Amino acid sequence: LNPTNNGLTSYSCRGKGSTLTVKPDFVHIGGLGYIDPEIGTGLYSVDNNSNITYNCGTSFSAPLVAKTMALVEKQIEGIVSRETLIALMVQNSHIPYAFDRPEYRTMLKELIGYGMPTSAHKILNGDEHSINLVFASRIKPKKEMVFEFMWPQCLIRNNKCYGDVKITLVSTPTIDYNYGDEMIRGNLNVTLSQTKDNGTSQYYLKPLYKDEAVREHGEYEWQLINENMKWQPIKVYHKEFKRGTTHYSPWKLRVSREDRDFNVVDNEGIPFTIIMTISDTSLEA
């Protein structure tokens, strides 16, 4: 990104990655692609002679992302799983202001990936208007896991749940390169729901960057891959309840697994981490 307005630099690459994965994963300041007479490239470093100089390139933006992840890992006591570290970074990345427009939504995952990570301090401390829930486990074939929880009381008004929810799922499925584009052999899905008065479930969540023109039901496999990130180890979902839900019954976070045909059965299961952030967008609760 440019240091002046966080827009794309002239040398920014555009995704997609292999197996249609989101690439780039993140973006960060890389310096202007030209020399400005006042600020140079806007990104400064120290050369071999200890002199301050200006540079640009992905070789400078990538270490800034890696530094943030390293600081997060260092400040957490004990061993942190790979899935949890990645989930923390993805969950706490934001869309730079220059890209926060409706007309850019369908292009963002190929331009900025999951966004620009915030600081390690903010990742670990959050803010006073949100709460983070972390679910980390392993899931075996043909199994599903259900986590029940209650919506924060401060966000329940008139028997309706308000607020904003963002969910990041990171897993490490089996990979077999002999299958080419189908190398990822396992897929995890996550749903967020409430049980209605008639006993049926009301499902929420929408994949990040999903094209609103794509229908919600009856999607073809290619649509599930492109829009719902099927067979992707990283999935991000978001939902804002501006008008509140229809009721405030207990919530269920459900994780399910599906495998490709002829997949090698793993006895330990696929490791995963889910981070769910519930926040008050009005900054009052």
Enumerate the predicted regions with their spans:
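Short, small-residue alpha-helix embedded
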Residues: 61-76
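Charged/polar, low-hydrophobicity segments characteristic of intrinsically disordered regions
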Residues: 96-116, 199-214
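Secreted peptidase-domain scaffold signal
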Residues: 105-196
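An often Trp-containing, charged/polar helix-loop segment at the C-terminal end
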Residues: 76-101
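Extended, solvent-exposed segments with strong compositional bias
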Residues: 128, 134-135, 200-244
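Residues within well-ordered beta-strands of beta-sheet-rich folds
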Residues: 27, 164-170, 252-254
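C-terminal edge strands of extracellular/lumenal beta-sandwich accessory domains
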Residues: 183-198, 239-285
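Catalytic-core environment of secreted peptidases
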Residues: 1-62, 79
